[in-house]
């Protein structure tokens, strides 16, 4: 478990942008049992690629005109059971953090794994997310 002085700023980076934190398996199930519409789920991490790439990219992407109906996050390595439950909704993908998933009507429609995040800037990540939003989300 990581100390709070490390994890809290990582949490607040997303929750401060409106992402709902899912800290327990029940939280995840509740979010996933509302299958209507779209939900962006960020699997957060304390690693540098989460801090410098994934979180900034996700926050930038949700400034677009077409955005998911809901945004949520689980914290890998901290809220382990919640993260494991979230990953159970992503069949066919190996555990990866950070990662970003888009669900539509309860089904996984887009997945950005760690290897697609590493070495890229926030704008590049946001661009890919915005393309997925344009394909799967309604306009504002």
Task: Give the ranges of each region predicted by the language model.
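Short acidic (Asp/Glu) patches
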Residues: 83-97
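Thiol-based oxidoreductase modules, predominantly thioredoxin-like and allied folds used
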Residues: 43, 66-85
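Typically the conserved alpha-helix immediately C-terminal to a functionally engaged Cys/Sec
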Residues: 51-64
């Amino acid at each position: 478990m990581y100390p709070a002085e490390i994890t809290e700023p990582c949490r607040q980076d997303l929750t401060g942008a409106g992402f709902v934190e899912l800290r327990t398996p029940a939280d995840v199930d509740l979010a996933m049992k509302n299958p209507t519409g779209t939900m962006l789920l960020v699997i957060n991490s304390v690693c540098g690629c989460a801090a410098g790439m994934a979180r900034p990219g996700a926050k930038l992407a949700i400034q677009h005109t077409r955005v998911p109906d809901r945004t949520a996050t689980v914290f890998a390595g901290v809220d382990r059971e919640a993260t494991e439950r979230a990953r159970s909704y992503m069949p066919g993908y190996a555990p990866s953090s950070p990662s970003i998933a888009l669900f539509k009507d309860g089904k996984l429609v887009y997945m950005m794994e760690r290897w697609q995040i590493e070495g890229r800037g926030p704008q590049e990540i946001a661009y890919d997310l915005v393309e997925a939003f344009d394909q799967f989300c309604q306009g504002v």
